[in-house]
Amino acid sequence: MLRVTTALALWCLVPIVLFTATAAEPAAELGLVTGSEKGTYYQFGLNLQALVKQAGIDLSVYPSKGSIENIYAVYQRPATQMGIVQSDVLAFVTRVQSDPVLKRIAKKTKMVFPLYNEEVHLLGRREITDFDDLADRRVAIGREGSGTYLTARLLLKVSEVVPKETVNIDTDEALAALKAGRVDAMFYVAGYPVKLFTESVAESDGLALIPITNKSITEFYPHAEIPAGTYAGQPNAVPTVAVKAVLISFDFRKRDCEMVGLFAETVAGNLPWLIKNGHPKWKSVDLAAPLKGWEQYDCVSQRLGKTGHAPTAAKPSGVNPVVDAIKEMLDK
């Protein structure tokens, strides 16, 4: 397994692996759709871009609204072969059997690698000390098309906590609204440390992370913890729940198989480089970890079996049926 301990032992081989990949393969062009420019997805994308450039792969990293947009983008945009999504988003999409497009997306979306746990950040006014306190409050739940939006709606539905108002705005807007008192709390699903909070939240803002310990929620989502001192004014660890970030591709057969396989080979052989030079969350990545309900893209598994080991956002085209289907199911 490509655990961190094994990966560190291979650190001295990094230059050799990169050189070999560069010499053996022609230059490749790939696109990766991520998330907010201040979120962990985007930082991971930039780390991957820097790594694979050394192997002759030109990786364009696109910001986006998040997981729901990303699933459809990988299916629909020719220059976007990969995306990062939350595990619960695709799990939810697979439940939709009435739409033929969604059925095809669910069937053909494949895992390149599992990445890391994404903690649910619930940031609010200091007087809000528990998830259940969101009842009768104004809560920002993320922009439609984001994984935060889906997870927030699922958590509220499962817990039967009913806010006074839910506000569909992106995380930058939500934080500004929270500071201005226009909302009382905001959701943000991302692996800590989140750049938006480390750069834009001060102790003087009077905000705090709200624990998520509701039993109805923890029956469905795995426990997680945001360590003490991760953010300003956070003296104690905060219990929460998490989802898994997953690097995905779409099984188009023959179109991008070789390029995605080369990309995966480069990443698998150079995890120590990412741990040393990338976002802190790379330290928790296990590229070989099993992930229930996900099948690894055979273009990746076959390639690894043989070897053993910021531009502007792409323009969306029209309506995203994934968003509409999710809203329809959650509103029932």
Name each model feature, range by range.
Residues Q49, Y62-K103, A174-A177, P193-V201:
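Pocket-flanking alpha-helical
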Residues A28, L32-V33, G39-Q76, T80-V85, ...:
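Extracytoplasmic small-molecule ligand-binding "clamshell" domains
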Residues E173-A176, A180, A190-E203, L209, ...:
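An extracytoplasmic/periplasmic, membrane-proximal ligand-sensing/linker region
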Residues S87, Q97-S98, V161-D256:
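Pocket-lining segment of extracytoplasmic ligand-binding domains
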Residues A27-K53, E118-A180:
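Bilobed "Venus flytrap"/periplasmic-binding protein-like clamshell domains
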